[in-house]
Amino acid sequence: MARVKRGVTSHAKHKKTLKAAKGFYGRRKNTIRAAKAAVDRSKQFAYRDRKVNKRNFRALWIQRINAAVREFGLTYGRFIDGLNKAGIEVDRKVLSDMAIHEPAAFGALVEASKKALAYLKDAGTANEFESAVR
């Protein structure tokens, strides 16, 4: 049985690591040990920031919705509350896009939200509102 030497696989691994470290500064781009540490760390940051990215986008959508809704005299929280009470289920990404690209449709949603809030203030319960809407 032939002896297995691992030079080929080691070389391939090293090459893969150095390729991933391309563009790094200093020794990190051309020595295996430093490059491996830098690449491992960069993967940790990438993993973490994929989660953070979702949070950042949600915050951006909420800021945009809040800015658009304030033009109609509501706050973000009251607007979302009104949408929930009116039974309108639209996610924040879509609301944000509507506020930017389709202001008329967004205005209709704001009016529906206001109507739901005003009706519930007068009527008192959500069940009465839902039966009145249907």
Swiss-Prot record:
InterPro entries in alphabetical order: Ribosomal_bL20, RIBOSOMAL_L20_CS, Ribosomal_protein_bL20_C
The keyword Cell inner membrane is annotated on this UniProt entry: no
Highest rank taxon of the organism: Bacteria
GO biological process, one term: ribosomal large subunit assembly
CC terms in the record's Gene Ontology section: ribonucleoprotein complex; ribosome
Keyword Methyltransferase: no
CDD domains documented for this protein: Ribosomal_L20
UniProt keyword terms in alphabetical order: Ribonucleoprotein, Ribosomal protein, RNA-binding, rRNA-binding
GO molecular function: rRNA binding; structural constituent of ribosome
UniProt family annotation: Belongs to the bacterial ribosomal protein bL20 family.
NCBIfam families for the chain: rplT_bact
Role of this protein: Binds directly to 23S ribosomal RNA and is necessary for the in vitro assembly process of the 50S ribosomal subunit. It is not involved in the protein synthesizing functions of that subunit.
Protein name, UniProt field: Large ribosomal subunit protein bL20
Organism: Sinorhizobium medicae (strain WSM419) (Ensifer medicae)
Lineage, opening ranks: Bacteria, Pseudomonadati, Pseudomonadota, Alphaproteobacteria, Hyphomicrobiales
